[in-house]
């Protein structure tokens, strides 16, 4: 089973699924690859509240997270 390999590699299932999805998108021909690249990005906002008021906002962007992961690997 493939589950044994991602566990043996020391990665989570979500990391494994992300790697597989990236490889599949890279195999697509150009007009379809560009459309798939546009769909894979995301932006998420997280708002922290203290005493019923907004204290801080964190914006999670897929591009920023990818850069952070590359920095952690090196």
Swiss-Prot record:
Q: List UniProt keywords, sorted A-Z.
A: ATP synthesis, CF(1), Hydrogen ion transport, Ion transport, Membrane, Mitochondrion, Mitochondrion inner membrane, Transport
Compartments it resides in: Mitochondrion; Mitochondrion inner membrane
Which GO molecular function entries does the Swiss-Prot or TrEMBL record give? proton-transporting ATP synthase activity, rotational mechanism
Top-rank lineage group of the source organism: Eukaryota
For biological process, the GO terms are: proton motive force-driven mitochondrial ATP synthesis
Task: Point out the coiled-coil segments of this chain.
Answer: none
Q: Which PANTHER family match?
A: ATP SYNTHASE EPSILON CHAIN, MITOCHONDRIAL, ATP SYNTHASE SUBUNIT EPSILON, MITOCHONDRIAL
- Record-given protein name: ATP synthase F(1) complex subunit epsilon, mitochondrial
Native organism: Dictyostelium discoideum
